[in-house]
Amino acid sequence: MVSIGGLPVPGRLILAPMAGVTDLAFRSVCRELGAAGAVSEMVSAQALVYQDGKTKALLRRERVPGLYGVQLFGKDPEVIARAAPKARELSGCDYLDLNMGCPTGKIVRNGEGCALMRDLPLAGRIIAAAVKAADVPVTVKLRKGWDNGSVCAVELARIAREEGAAAVCVHGRTRAQMYSGRADWDIIREVKRAVDIPVIANGTFLSRRMRRIS
């Protein structure tokens, strides 16, 4: 059985986080249908530190048994370090996930999400800060790269491993692709072969036959 930082994952399918989609009700339904785990919608670390009420509501954990992760996004290591224990305290989550893959304009224009794949040293500092501050495993969600001219998923995955991340989740598209076209599973294979932590594949999963990449 695969484990994330010592946490057994009771299955091969984990519901990926998506803002505006994977809310509490949707996660609960997917859990009841067999998902081994689920991750919250992405939560602003800055808003969590400021104790925003709407942000806190995103942290609510579904009652169905299974792994639960809270996904944080931000660009300041100190803010991430302050938000990590708050997220754990308010949600009772099993692990924290760092968003370094969101492609939406308002996020990347602020230097967050997939923009961090253009500043790998900063990404590494954010991961290190989260790992140090959290008392649960930390994972990292990333993409293939910014565009096909700057593919850096393997490099960022190695940095994540070096800084103490327990697993990485790789979306096989670049930021330039957004959600169009098919995900590149070859880059996910490359990441899997490059690091000795669990690698979760994400993107273009349309049937149960597509759930494992070797």
At which residue positions do the language-model features occur?
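Flavin-dependent oxidoreductase catalytic cores
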Residues: M1-S214
